[in-house]
A protein has these predicted regions:
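N-terminal membrane topogenesis motif
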Residues: 1-28, 84, 88, 233-261, ...
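Helix-loop junctions and terminal segments of transmembrane helices
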Residues: 64-79, 304-326
Length: 556
């Protein structure tokens, strides 16, 4: 493979690394939420989600978007060999999160009673537990962004896995510990203290991830020093100028990300307020919202994480080629990113809808809400495609310096989202379905507006057949066959083993077999229909092995 082709496919290779990490961390996230939900219940999940949504918004405002900003600014400076300035940006970013993160943590802790909806006071102590995490998250983000700018996603990927493992272990352990230590057997207190313990796991995970990144940085310190020493450009910038660059870059990115994600807080606030207006008990409203955010939202975010990985991985490559005015190469990166994302996201959405019941039965088998959880997952699974595409296009626009455009698009989408959601909640009895429909509408609008903007500012025209039509056709066929296959294998195995194997274990076995069947069917179809080339397949995790298998099976 030529040097040029190697460089062009590097973004996919790096995205694959992040994608694997994203899959692993999301799977861990889903798996640990299952025992946590069994411990704290849907009501506890509701308090946890309310607090986490507020925490996330404050994190976005203070420092969450700093990795993207650091990655973009540092990679742009490195593209023109200004290594001294690149390292100065890194140091200034650390000072930035020290100040801003500290202030945000204090505001969160002391202002929790104001930030939490007035009819959900039990979520206040959960938010206070999360407050210190904001401070440490900023530092973790700076280190991740710095390594991403160096076109290596391995440190970020490993730190994400380490963080999530620590989060999972501490969340489960602390939830049990808090309940036994503080609830005193009171059923009304169990959801609150359980949610507090689960929230403590987030902080433990972030601190563990930060310690890991500090270790990796110390191991590479000599390399960074040599990099600075070989800077012979003679160009330098004052710390004042660099802080201004960071501020000018971070502010619109933060605003864009904030508006892009604030829909969860808006949804939460509208849902709680309107359900309260309809005289629904606060505990019931919290339980319902726990189903939406703690089950449905957790599950659809697994495939969306793949788009986040692609967006994160491609920003340095897009930013670097755009800085060098190599627009053709830049458009090539965009084309690869969107195609790669759709090949994964479309079957994930269809497959999740087809296997909604066994997924819920295995992970969240609470009998009181399982039918509702299955129904909203089947209804809203299509939003995975829209969120994935809007996330990638958001990253493209930020990578080419149009950071205000996603902000505008998100703001327009949010306003129309609220216009739809409010009457659906007020004048119908859709309840959670109103949230599902409104979030689907919001994701679709973001997807549409962002892609129109990419076309306008980059002159990019999307290829449709290989990117959308073939994956969609393959996924629909796969979904139908997978659903029938699951029903058949469950009928057979339950007849043979049903009398001495627990239902949940039996469903899990059938689910795993069905997922394997679905993956094989999808990739056979998409390869036969020429939706993926050999070169593209090599960029998947274990790509060379997949190519050998495809050739042996005469699919390539």
């Amino acid at each position: 493979m030529s040097s040029k082709n190697t460089k062009e496919t590097n973004v996919l290779a790096q995205a694959s690394i992040l994608m694997v990490a994203g899959i692993v961390t999301r799977i861990i996230g889903v798996l640990y939420r299952s025992p946590v939900t069994s411990i704290i219940g849907d009501e506890g999940n509701g308090y946890y989600s309310i607090a986490v949504n507020i925490y996330t918004m404050i994190l976005l405002i203070s420092s969450y978007s700093i990795p993207m900003a650091v990655s973009k600014v540092v990679s742009a400076k490195m593209a023109v060999h200004q290594y001294k300035i690149a390292h100065k940006v890194f140091k200034c970013a650390l000072i930035y999160v020290l100040v801003i993160g500290g202030i945000a943590s204090l505001i969160t802790f002391f202002g929790a009673s104001v930030l939490i909806p007035s009819n959900q006071p039990k979520a206040i102590p959960v938010l206070r537990i999360l407050a210190p995490t904001i401070f440490f998250s900023g530092f973790l983000g700076v280190f991740r962004g710095y390594f991403q700018a160096h076109r290596t996603m391995i440190p970020t990927s490993l730190s994400q896995i380490v963080e999530q493992v620590a989060n999972a272990v501490i969340s489960i352990g602390a939830a049990v510990l808090f309940i036994h230590a503080f609830a005193g057997g009171d059923a009304d207190k169990i959801p609150v203290f359980g949610a507090m313990g689960s929230a403590a796991g987030i902080g433990a995970g972030v601190i563990t991830g930060l310690l890991f990144m500090l270790f990796i940085y110390s191991c590479n310190k000599k390399y960074f020093k040599k990099e600075i020493q070989k800077d012979d450009t003679g160009v330098d910038s004052s710390y004042k100028d660099i802080f201004r660059i960071i501020f000018m870059m971070v502010t619109p990115v933060i605003l864009s990300t904030f508006v892009y994600n604030i829909s969860t807080v808006v949804d939460q606030t509208l849902f709680m307020d309107i359900m309260g207006f309809k005289r629904m008990a606060s505990e019931t409203a919290a339980s319902l919202y726990g189903v939406f955010s703690g089950k449905y939202w957790v599950l659809i975010n697994v495939p969306i994480a793949l788009a986040n990985s692609m967006s994160t991985a491609m920003i340095p490559a897009i930013s670097g080629s755009y800085e060098l005015k190599d627009y053709k190469k830049c458009r090539g990166h965009v084309r690869q990113a969107i195609h790669f994302t759709m090949v994964i996201s479309i079957p994930a959405a269809i497959g999740m809808g087809a296997l909604a019941y066994p997924i819920m039965e295995v992970l969240f088998p609470q009998k009181a809400t399982i039918d509702l959880a299955v129904s909203i997952l089947r209804t809203g699974c299509i939003s995975i495609i829209f969120y994935a595409l809007s996330t990638v296009s958001n990253g493209v626009l930020q990578g080419i310096g149009k950071v205000n455009i996603p902000l505008r698009n998100a703001a327009v989408s949010l306003v129309l989202h609220v216009v739809l959601l409010t009457p659906l909640l007020y004048f119908t009895n859709l309840n959670l379905y109103a949230l599902v429909f409104a979030t689907m509408f919001y994701a679709f609008l973001m997807c549409l507006l962002n892609n129109l903007s990419v076309r306008k500012y980059l002159g990019y025209h999307q290829e449709m057949k290989r990117t959308f039509m073939i994956p969609l056709l393959s996924s629909v066929i796969m979904g139908i066959l997978c659903y029938v296959f699951y029903q058949g294998i469950y009928l057979i195995l339950s007849g043979i083993f049903g009398s001495f194997i627990h239902l949940r274990i039996l469903v899990f076995i059938c689910l795993m077999i069905s997922v394997g069947f679905a993956v094989i069917v999808y990739f056979v179809l998409v390869l036969k229909l020429k939706g993926i080339t050999e070169a593209e397949l090599r960029n998947f995790p274990k790509g060379n092995m997949l190519v050998r298998m495809a050739k042996k099976s005469k699919l390539l």
